[in-house]
Amino acid sequence: NGEADIAIANSYYIGIMLSGSAGEDQLTAAKKVRMIFPNQDNRGTHINISGAGILKNSPNPTNANLFLEFLLSKRVQKYMVDKSYEYPIVDGVLPSKEIASFGISFKEDQTSVQKYGELNPDAVRLMDRSGWK
């Protein structure tokens, strides 16, 4: 029936639901949950990233760099946070009101993204062994 005492979700899904853009039933459901940022007394909360980069063999690194600078402009960051309900990466850009409603100040886990890649095969083996699907 979709009820649970606790769930794990990316913050932007709750932002979309709170915005009302996913429909009235999603808005009603979102109003029944509370966001909690775990591990604030130790390592911090896991964060996902949406990233962009330039390949070392890119045929047009100058324009690729200009595009990245464009993505990091305050104007584009504001547009992105208002449409994607993700946290901004640029100082001085505030998150959407939906995201801000459950907090903008929390301790982030500083684990290197590279480490996630290194440990991925072990994580997959653990999930396979446990029968996780």
Question: Locations of the language-model features?
Answer:
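Generic recognition of short, well-ordered alpha-helical interface segments
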Residues: A9-Y12, I47-I49, T62, E118, ...
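A residue-level structural signature of the nucleotidyltransferase/glycosyltransferase Rossmann-like core
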Residues: D5-I6, H46, E69
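Mature extracytoplasmic/periplasmic domains
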Residues: S50-T111
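Solvent-exposed loop/turn segments at secondary-structure junctions
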Residues: Y12-G15, Q40-R43, P59, K74-Q77
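Extracellular/periplasmic bilobal clamshell ligand-binding domains
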Residues: K97-K133
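Periplasmic-binding protein-like
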Residues: L27-S58
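Ligand-binding pocket segment of bilobal, Venus flytrap-like solute-binding proteins
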Residues: N1-P38
